[in-house]
Amino acid sequence: MPIRRLPPETVNRIAAGEVVERPASAIKELVDNAIDAGATRIEVEAHGGGLTRILVADDGCGLSPEELPVAIERHATSKLAPDADGLWDLLRIHTMGFRGEALPSIGSVARLQISSRAKGAKDAFSILVEGGQVGEVAPAAFPGPHGARIEVRDLFYATPARLKFMKSERAEALAITEEIKRQAMANESVGFSLDIDGRRVLRLPPEHPGPQGRLARLAAVLGREFQENALEIDQTRDGVRLSGFAGLPTYNRGNAAHQYLFVNGRPVRDRLLQGALRAAYADFLARDRHPTAALYVTLETTEVDVNVHPAKAEVRFRDPALVRGLIVGALRHALAGAGHRASTTVAAQALDSIRAQQSPFPGYQPQYQPGPSPAGFSAWREGGWTPPTQRPMDLPGLNEVSARVEPSYGGDLAGVVREAYAAAAFEDRPPTDYPGATAPFDPVDYPLGAARAQVHETYIVAQTRDGMVIVDQHAAHERLVYERMKGEMASGGVTRQTLLLPEVVDLDPAEAERVVARAEELAGLGLVLESFGPGAVLVRETPALLGKTDAAALVRDIADDLAENGQALALKERLEEVCSTMACHGSVRAGRRLNGAEMNALLREMEATPHSGQCNHGRPTYVELKLADIEKLFGRR
């Protein structure tokens, strides 16, 4: 078959397949043009999932009648210009668009009408393109002083085969909504409105430039919960700036759909950035949970290539390691600064669950019959009414409140705290001299309050200044042990304790081989072992932090970790996985009764330890209930 030159209409339709994949893609290109035109307000309408009709109106600089026919020519744009040497540099791009493909591509597969009034002009003009056929420029009505109105009807009518690959109208409408949300998050100083089939879906007024305006826009798009649980990010390294907001580890999702990344104001989906985000949270979330974030990378245009994807959805960095390191470092710095803070949604979900209960004591029946109605208070005083005899109530769980803390400990509390640390597997660590160590704990003095009770030998109940805190003792102590092990590992190695009698652990031969192959790494974590014949290892030393631990169970869990992740993870990540497993074994277990000093020692350590708001698997270590919320439960508010 001989080589042929394709006609312009076919070329444009091929280009449209790359640039205009679906209605949301067309809207993205039109919104990009509006932003480049300096618009402060952008209105978007879509009907029939965007296939029937799309309208994008803006108050930008507009187009003159001479520019209208040029705007729909392929590779014609106002966003690139030659430098002093006559060179067209594609690395110095400061606009959203630059290819000059969007309008001709859309016009080749749909009915496209552009109406515009240039800034300072008296008259408005329009041009119509149908399936690649260009009409004449003609005078037109235009509602605003300047700007453009671009209407797209019957998208893909000229390429019926493409229509077969479209999803349902609902799915296309959701994609359009998501696209406008991304554009709105990238441009907080621009007002956006979106109507789907005549129904207002979004209405976002312009916000002031800066972190507060950006956070207000993110709250309007992602919800107030994100605003309440977001950490501000603002770090710069070697000319690259990372700003934005990232959610607390306990404010996570089941997928990565709530991760928004922007490079020089451009929404992108970049694997490097997403991988960096995962790495930053790897220490705080389970593998099936994902963080929430809206991150903005700003750098010189010469350091990033945006001309690597037809729809400009991907970018390529000149120094990807620098960008990845900045993201990981900045996020971990912010997470460390959050201390023991946990997501507010944890308490909200708990309260919602309580409110949903129809009966607070299912299956419980009162064990007495009320007496006759009294004649009144005066009759009671005169002996005319005797209150009924009430038998003790047998409420489910009432007798399982396993420990109660008295308001005052008396004596040398510092000594009691030392014993608490020993009992809580902090034997080799001198206790912290907390303020007021020789006086009763006052809930006003501490963020996590003063312990009042232990429930079901699992949960610590503490009174705070304006509410109460419920702590999962195992999850909290697991994070404390983990953080200390990481600190010791970073400073030269985890302190070991020698077993009086070395313990032989039987394993599968393949498991034993994997564990022995990592013996040097494990020794750095305080676990010293060696081969003891086929399918067995001999444990000589264990981490001192773990106290008295089940060495066999620990080694078997480590063998499972290495089997699952040993080849896939880097050395540092492997060590952290093993650290996490060890910390789980060395933690205060659920079902263990703690005394008052032990509980308060755990609370004080949580307050002093970064990341203590969640365990190693991303679950919350405590739930805080404000007094106002408790009063609402009882109808006092």
Swiss-Prot record:
GO cellular component terms, alphabetically, are: mismatch repair complex
- One biological process term in Gene Ontology: mismatch repair
Q: What domain of life does the native source organism fall in?
A: Bacteria
Q: Which UniProt keywords apply?
A: DNA damage, DNA repair
Query: What molecular function terms (GO) are annotated for this protein?
Result: ATP binding; ATP hydrolysis activity; ATP-dependent DNA damage sensor activity; mismatched DNA binding
Listed Gene3D superfamilies: 3.30.230.10, Histidine kinase-like ATPase, C-terminal domain, MutL, C-terminal domain, dimerisation subdomain, MutL, C-terminal domain, regulatory subdomain
PROSITE patterns, alphabetized: DNA_MISMATCH_REPAIR_1 (PS00058)
User: Which CDD domains does the annotation name?
Assistant: HATPase_MutL-MLH-PMS-like, MutL_Trans_MutL
| Pfam families from the UniProt entry | DNA_mis_repair, HATPase_c_3, MutL_C
Keyword DNA damage, does the record have it? yes
Role of this protein: This protein is involved in the repair of mismatches in DNA. It is required for dam-dependent methyl-directed DNA mismatch repair. May act as a 'molecular matchmaker', a protein that promotes the formation of a stable complex between two or more DNA-binding proteins in an ATP-dependent manner without itself being part of a final effector complex.
Assigned protein family:
Belongs to the DNA mismatch repair MutL/HexB family.
HAMAP family per UniProt: DNA_mis_repair
Under which name does UniProt file this protein?
Answer: DNA mismatch repair protein MutL
Species in which this protein is naturally found: Caulobacter vibrioides (strain NA1000 / CB15N) (Caulobacter crescentus)
Taxonomic lineage per UniProt? Bacteria, Pseudomonadati, Pseudomonadota, Alphaproteobacteria, Caulobacterales
Q: In the UniProt record, what gene is named as encoding this protein? A: mutL
